[in-house]
């Protein structure tokens, strides 16, 4: 039986009860009420409490208290007497000693109290009130009964532990005496004659102790390496043949493992042959050379830097085992979801807790869990190409630019075995985002571990290191307004298929603090549509489809009224990607861009509108001056697909876009990024206000998949776009993006299953308020961009007939 927090005031993790049955048959303790005034506690166990009580009276009280404690609950009788009798005894004029009246509990009351105590040793106030009402007891009686029962349990447990320790002590004393007797008359084990013992120096004793410790550590490391490498390692195998100039000295005191180059090359001579595969620059038994681990420029948190890197490896292996099992297991771990649910299956958390040990510790109080699994085919050469993308932080963040605000490799703990990604281990830090100012960024520090499961099959797992630094509050604490988040073993399992595709099974399991998330977005996050496996896999499929089209010789171009070369199309797509990345950075307020929030200078702007400013001096691709960004999110009672088609239609932009000059826009060219309608990059031309004014060009990128959609656009100069369309460098083309992010509003359970009521629309604008970087931001500029957002949202609702 497990009593969580029984002996530590209710706040600890609890302990395992060491006995097969409880202590219900043992005599209960007779405990008194403690009172700060000292007047009540002295009277609870006897008839008098005055200073003149005799020794005989004290003996009588002790005898009575002992008799009163015969039942499992009789130690609460004193509490029943703490009513009106206490008031009478407290009066100074009452010198007559009276015997305390005890109210004993009935067997039924004791049975009910004991039954609840076995289920919950620490009942809350509501449970105590219900029990007192049901048993016709005072609430204080129930409260102090549980207090005394816990004290009794603790005391009896301590007595039992003391008895065990005493037995162990007696046993050690007996062994010590036996050894002393044997040392007085030592005998030779070979011939049986008396032996003469030589003196052993203190230094030799220390060396023997150190040798035993190193041997134990070597056994542990070899067992770990056997599991890591997937092949047995013999402790008696000789080290590989090394060149004379690569001979390695012995360590001074401890076994420093050079996993990922952490321990240094000086310790490799103590390891068995196959363990050299962890080290850098040393030949392995297979004849290959292992690339040494590299140190990154990012600063490693001090508390993380103090952790032994072999602990990282143990955590990564445990997380990998959990990921593979979660990707392969079905019912009862994964059960079918309700009809209409965004996911086909949901995690059975009760079965999960029975199947896996929490490798990063128990879920903190107040956290909620979200777990999802999704499988699908991805257009990619092979699974190894996807592994290379996931293990490179830059390519990973580019692939999921709408979800990853910032990614950094803090340390490359292990580069893998034999120059491959098998066994590669990275310590990373990332900022995950939802394109809305109402959802804080999730900042997480985690390990990313890669393993080859079979030929053409790989797995990449992420796991937070919070469990390793859980005793330090600042070890991986989020910064700024970011939300607290823990990444339970999550990742993907990849398998090559004969038709040129790669089957990917994605598992996402996260624990986070929901208190900082806006009520509007909580259903979305709980359903897994914001950070779940469905969104990761849908984004991966869309991006890989786009890359496949770009790598093909025939890029699909629709409505091509302007001839664009292949180089021009690539340059135009590169510019559109930069535009979308800048748009996402302006919405999420990531630390990747130097945005400053204007919390106290926004005047009458609503709390759901985030306003930020940034000074651009000489950054390529941005106009110099003070840039103002404003974003907000609203609920629109329109299906996400309908809202997306309305916003991307150039013929309908006059209904909401002030850049259209009140008329329809013309699509000059369109580059398709996928087979699904809506994934494209377009160049639009707005109608000229007058004959003397040249028309404006607008670059627009639209993306959509099963998880959501975005529409991003920015005005561009005509000469700059002519250069880009001719294949020129788009790095220095200045633009400030604006646009929309569309997400489903999260499923709600209706009469026939899950139902979706509308869309969550995020509107964001970036405008140049002053072309002088040193200029100060004015209140008028802030109000202007706020009015622009409000007016745009109102026009969209009016056009969709949902402004009521």
UniProtKB/Swiss-Prot annotation:
DNA-binding region range list: 98-157
GO molecular function, one term: lipid binding
Keywords associated with the record: Coiled coil, DNA-binding, Homeobox, Nucleus, Transcription, Transcription regulation
Domain of life: Eukaryota
Keyword Magnesium included in the entry's annotation: no
Residue ranges occupied by any START domain in the UniProt entry: 305-549
SUPFAM superfamilies cross-referenced by the UniProt entry: Bet v1-like, Homeodomain-like
Protein family per UniProt: Belongs to the HD-ZIP homeobox family. Class IV subfamily.
Function: Probable transcription factor.
Name of the featured protein: Homeobox-leucine zipper protein ROC5
UniProt lineage: Eukaryota, Viridiplantae, Streptophyta, Embryophyta, Tracheophyta
Gene designation: ROC5
């Amino acid at each position: 039986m497990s009593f969580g927090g029984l002996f530590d005031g209710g706040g600890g993790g609890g302990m395992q009860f060491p006995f097969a049955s409880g202590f219900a048959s043992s005599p209960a303790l007779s405990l008194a009420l403690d009172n700060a005034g000292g007047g009540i506690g002295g009277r609870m166990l006897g008839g008098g409490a005055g200073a003149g009580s005799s020794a005989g009276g004290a003996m009588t009280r002790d005898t009575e208290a002992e008799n009163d404690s015969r039942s499992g609950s009789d130690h609460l009788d004193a509490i029943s007497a703490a009513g009106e009798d206490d008031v009478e005894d407290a009066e100074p004029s009452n010198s007559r000693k009276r015997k305390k009246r005890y109210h004993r509990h009935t067997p039924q009351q004791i049975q009910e109290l004991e039954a609840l105590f076995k289920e919950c040793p620490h009942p809350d106030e509501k449970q105590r009130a219900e029990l007192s009402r049901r048993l016709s007891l005072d609430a204080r009686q129930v409260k102090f009964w549980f207090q005394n029962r816990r004290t009794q349990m603790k005391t009896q447990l301590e007595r039992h532990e003391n008895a065990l320790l005493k037995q162990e002590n007696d046993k050690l004393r007996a062994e010590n005496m036996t050894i002393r007797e044997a040392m007085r008359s030592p005998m030779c084990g070979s011939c049986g004659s008396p032996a003469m013992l030589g003196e052993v120096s203190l230094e030799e004793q220390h060396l023997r102790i150190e040798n035993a410790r190193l041997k134990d550590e070597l056994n542990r490391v070899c067992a770990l390496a056997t599991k890591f490498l997937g092949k047995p390692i013999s402790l008696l195998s000789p080290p590989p043949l090394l060149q004379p100039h690569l001979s390695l000295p012995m360590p001074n005191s401890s076994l420093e493992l050079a996993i990922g180059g952490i321990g240094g090359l000086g310790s490799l001579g103590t390891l068995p042959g196959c363990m050299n595969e962890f080290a850098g620059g040393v030949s392995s038994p297979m004849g290959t050379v292992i690339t040494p681990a590299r140190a990154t420029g990012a600063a490693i948190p001090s508390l993380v830097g103090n952790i032994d890197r072999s602990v990282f490896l143990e955590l990564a292996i445990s997380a990998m085992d959990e990921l593979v099992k979660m990707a392969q297991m079905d019912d009862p771990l994964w059960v079918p979801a309700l009809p209409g649910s965004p996911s086909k299956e949901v995690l059975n958390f009760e079965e999960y807790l029975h199947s896996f040990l929490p490798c990063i510790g128990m879920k903190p109080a107040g956290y909620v869990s979200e777990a999802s699994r999704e499988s699908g085919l991805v257009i990619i050469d092979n699974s190894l190409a996807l592994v290379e993308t996931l293990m490179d932080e830059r390519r990973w963040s580019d692939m999921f630019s709408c979800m990853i605000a910032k990614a950094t490799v803090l340390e490359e703990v292990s580069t893998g075995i034999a120059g491959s990604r098998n066994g590669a281990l990275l310590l990373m830090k990332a900022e995950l985002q939802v394109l809305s100012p109402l959802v804080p960024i999730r900042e997480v520090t985690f390990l990313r571990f890669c393993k080859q499961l079979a030929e053409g099959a790989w797995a990449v797992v992420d796991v937070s290191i919070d469990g390793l630094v859980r005793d330090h509050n600042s070890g991986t604490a989020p910064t700024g307004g970011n939300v607290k988040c823990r990444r339970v073993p999550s990742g993907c399992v990849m398998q090559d298929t004969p038709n040129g595709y790669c089957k990917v099974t994605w598992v996402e399991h996260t624990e986070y603090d929901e208190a900082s998330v806006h009520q509007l977005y909580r259903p979305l996050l709980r359903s897994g549509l914001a950070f779940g496996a469905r969104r990761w896999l849908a984004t991966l499929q869309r991006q890989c489809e786009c890359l496949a089209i770009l790598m093909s010789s025939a890029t699909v171009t629709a409505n091509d009224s302007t001839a664009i070369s292949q180089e021009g199309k690539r340059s135009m797509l590169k510019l559109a990607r930069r535009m979308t990345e800048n748009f996402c950075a302006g919405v999420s307020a990531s630390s990747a861009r130097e945005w400053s929030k204007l919390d106290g200078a926004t005047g009458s702007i609503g709390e759901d509108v985030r306003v930020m400013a940034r000074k651009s001096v000489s950054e390529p691709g941005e106009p110099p001056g003070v840039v103002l960004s404003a974003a907000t999110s609203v609920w629109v009672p329109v299906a996400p697909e309908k809202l997306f088609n309305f916003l991307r239609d150039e013929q309908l932009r006059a209904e909401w876009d002030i850049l259209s000059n009140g008329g329809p826009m013309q699509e000059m060219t369109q580059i398709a990024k996928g087979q699904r309608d809506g994934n494209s990059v377009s160049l639009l031309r707005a109608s000229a206000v007058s004959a003397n004014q040249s028309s404006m060009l607008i670059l627009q990128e639209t993306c959509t998949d099963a998880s959501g959609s975005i529409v991003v656009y920015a005005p561009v100069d005509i000469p700059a776009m002519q250069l880009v369309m001719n294949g020129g460098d788009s790095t220095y083309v200045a633009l400030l993006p604006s646009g929309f992010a569309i997400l489903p509003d999260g499923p709600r359970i209706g009469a026939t299953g899950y139902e979706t009521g509308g869309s969550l629309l995020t509107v964001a604008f970036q405008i140049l308020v002053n072309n002088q970087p040193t200029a100060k931001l004015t209140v008028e500029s802030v109000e202007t961009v706020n009015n622009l957002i409000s007016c745009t949202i109102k026009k969209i609702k009016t056009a969709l007939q949902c402004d009521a």
